[in-house]
Amino acid sequence: MLAKLLTKIFGSRNDRTLCRMSKAVDAINQMEPAMEQLSDEQLAAKTVEFRDCIAQGATVDSLLPEAFAVVREASKRVFGMRHFDVQLMGGMVLNDRCIAEMRTGEGKTLTATLPAYLNALSGKGVHVVTVNDYLAQRDAENNRPLFEFLGLSVGINLPGLPAPAKRAAYAADITYGTNNEYGFDYLRDNMAFSPEERVQRKLHYALVDEVDSILIDEARTPLIISGPAEDSSDMYRRVDKLIPHLIRQDKEDSESFQGEGHFSVDEKSRQVNLTERGLMLIEELLVKAGIMEEGESLYSPANIMLMHHVTAALRAHVLFARDVDYIVKDGEVIIVDEHTGRTMPGRRWSDGLHQAVEAKENVAIQNENQTLASITFQNYFRLYEKLAGMTGTADTEAFEFSSIYKLDTIVVPTNRPMIRKDLADLVYMTEKEKIDAIIEDIKTCTERGQPVLVGTISIEKSELVSGELEKAGIAHKVLNAKFHAMEADIVAQAGQPGAVTIATNMAGRGTDIVLGGSWQAEVAALESPDEQQIAAIKDAWQPRHEAVLAAGGLHIIGTERHESRRIDNQLRGRSGRQGDAGSSRFYLSMEDALMRIFASDRVSGMMRKLGMKPGEAIEHPWVTKAIANAQRKVESRNFDIRKQLLEYDDVANDQRCAIYTQRNELLDVADISETVKSIREDVLKTILDSYIPPQSLEEMWDVQGLEHRLKDDFDLDMPVAQWLDDEPGLHEEILRERVLEQMLAQYQRKEEIVGSDIMRNFEKGVMLQTLDSLWKEHLAAMDYLRQGIHLRGYAQKDPKQEYKRESFAMFAAMLESLKYEVISMLSKVQVRMPEEVEAMEQQRREEAERLARQQQLSHQAPVEELTQGSAAAAQEGRKVGRNDPCPCGSGKKFKHCHGKLQ
């Protein structure tokens, strides 16, 4: 109550911020006449002037009013578009490390040019982040003339570009690209083997378009660079055949309930749990299939990977549906983004889930992958010195932006008042009744020439509505993941009189729906149109535009509520842009996922009390409130999941930063011999301490063990026992120094043979390779730890604290292993004189020829075939270890057989 009273007196924080900014807007407007007097050359020269000011110590913020006035004037001359006052405010919000909520059609792309120009003046680079490649390319090309007029360079960071092109894109003053590509480039840079391979500069300023989609919807999806692991595709197929024998039951077994089914599904948490009966059946089926031994348990440690396969197969069949979560195209399973409805080629689910879905759909199963490097968007974007974002819908997630990213959300007013009518939800008992009502609404709209945009939550639902429209004889276009390439064209013309467009979720975000259709799109479709053709297209568009306005503008139909209110608002926001007329309505049924899982009891109780008849809809504030509460519950749950994910990932992030910092220091230093020397002393001290404890009696020394360890791990023949026999009074400290001297002397001899330059490069290469290999293993170990850590809660321990403690111990152990393995490898490496190398090569060739003759004489497969076979095996991911049996069937180890030929 008090808070409301104070807000009434002093205004909200948002109002006070806008009031402060309006003074800066007045200052910019006062500069406009002076800017108009400048010639093009004088206006462009302002950039050099600003850069000189920054070089002399001026801050970017102190230049804001004049810099914004320069961009506004340049935009008038280049595009014929003048930034509105509210767009200037939006630019200030973005410069202040905040999120600007600007409604659809308010010109976010043009607004972004203001802070992008201002922050590019420092010369540290600006990254404009978009949700897909099409928008990155479109925005870069659209804004390039403006920035180049002002003397700034523009780069586009697209997937698949060669390293020199990427480096050039990042070296530009302003770089456009997708969130995925920026993140992957960061990971790739931290896997580089020379400074020249890196493409990114220091991360300075990120300006994120559709910030809610990237920082919230995709926050739970880590970016992973992976390499192939062992092949287990056959096991996925064998286990997949067993799943159809299992029967679902409604709820989980408990003391009071024992079901007849084999598994239960928790739709809220998207988990599948085997019942006791199900476990017995699956064990029986696994034994019959010859996958498991009689009498074994699926939960025994030996069958941990088998349990992993069963769980993945069960989830693939029960939780993941074709044309909802994924599509099958050209024999490949492609994930559909649940938030945008777009396909994500190249993305794969982890933990064997993707392979299980491939087995279910009977397509080629690709190898499981092992993580080489990963980062979440939450942690990647927090690496920037300065972060800001813009979207049409951020206010509902303001708390999350503030608590996780330290970004305040400012709602920027619209240039013209919004007059869209948001009609109350209509709730039906069944899905069929709801679809029938939607078709009737569409018919009514098309009869009066009003365009309709129908929003669905999955491909399956969009095709269901499409099928019903076909039956009713209503012409329409479908925009979903299957027709991804036509997205922008379909959306651009969705405002034509009487047009009906079905869109999955918010596919097509970033493209405005113009009432009457886009005349610019019609012009773009023509090959080099002349002035007369353009004028004719504009003249034809004007009456269409007025007819649509008279019919009520664009009508939005939501076929069901999304889990998040924000995504519903995004759908509504496609209508009523720039003060245009428009309307929206959501149609719901008691069979919708959200209603069934979160709101069914309360709402169905209300419907029964109101005496609902088939085909009748309920339209009541109570129902709308119950649905909003259900959505808040889901949003709160999803926020908790993201927050928890971040808390766990922060532990890994600290370690990631430490490893990447160390790795970059290694790359940037030409000579790491001092580091190697220091590590060698540490390693040797640890080994000597374990066999010759400090200040201990000679009887406690394990001299024989020390000799074996030095020989096996460091290829050092140290007659320690002989030294002690020859010098009975040899002191422990002198012994330690002698071992170190011998080790250094052996290493020095190798360096004399190959030269110091080669040895320095070799040291760096060994250090980087070992670091990468151990980091990869550490990531896998962290994954396993993370998956089971929640069980510590049963022992009255805090899983997060346990995870921090254990992961730190694992990290410390990894760093010790790094030291040990680097020194071991450097000590064991054999160096040869050039003539020795040539003699060994000749011997190897003769041995290969002898083996080939032997095999032909004994009627075995020719060598070429066998080597091709092993190469094919390698291509398929079946890497043959040097100590594994040779694939030729000789019974010998690979290194003693065909491994000799490689």
UniProtKB/Swiss-Prot annotation:
Induction: Repressed under conditions of excess protein secretion capacity and derepressed when protein secretion becomes limiting. This is regulated by SecM. This is Protein translocase subunit SecA. SMART domains: SecA_DEAD, SecA_PP_bind. HAMAP family: SecA (MF_01382). Belongs to the SecA family. Its EC number is 7.4.2.8. Part of the Sec protein translocase complex. Interacts with the SecYEG preprotein conducting channel. Has a central role in coupling the hydrolysis of ATP to the transfer of proteins into and across the cell membrane, serving both as a receptor for the preprotein-SecB complex and as an ATP-driven molecular motor driving the stepwise translocation of polypeptide chains across the membrane. It is an enzyme of class 7 (translocase). Residues 851-902 are annotated as: Disordered. Pfam families: P-loop_SecA (PF21090), SEC-C (PF02810), SecA_DEAD (PF07517), SecA_PP_bind (PF01043), SecA_SW (PF07516). It catalyses: ATP + H2O + cellular proteinSide 1 = ADP + phosphate + cellular proteinSide 2. GO terms for cellular component: cell envelope Sec protein transport complex; cytosol; plasma membrane. It is found in: Cell inner membrane; Cytoplasm. Its main location: membrane. Its cofactor is Zn(2+). It is a peripheral membrane protein. Residues 892-902 have a biased composition (Basic residues). It comes from Sodalis glossinidius (strain morsitans). Zn(2+) binds at C886, C888, C897, H898. The keyword Cell membrane applies. May bind 1 zinc ion per subunit. Keywords: ATP-binding, Cell inner membrane, Cell membrane, Cytoplasm, Membrane, Metal-binding, Nucleotide-binding, Protein transport, Translocase, Translocation, Transport, Zinc. The lineage of its organism: Bacteria, Pseudomonadati, Pseudomonadota, Gammaproteobacteria, Enterobacterales. InterPro entries: Helicase_ATP-bd (IPR014001), P-loop_NTPase (IPR027417), SEC_C_motif (IPR004027), SecA (IPR000185), SecA_CS (IPR020937), SecA_DEAD (IPR011115), SecA_motor_DEAD (IPR014018), SecA_preprotein_X-link_dom (IPR011130). GO terms for biological process: intracellular protein transmembrane transport; protein import; protein targeting; protein transport by the Sec complex.
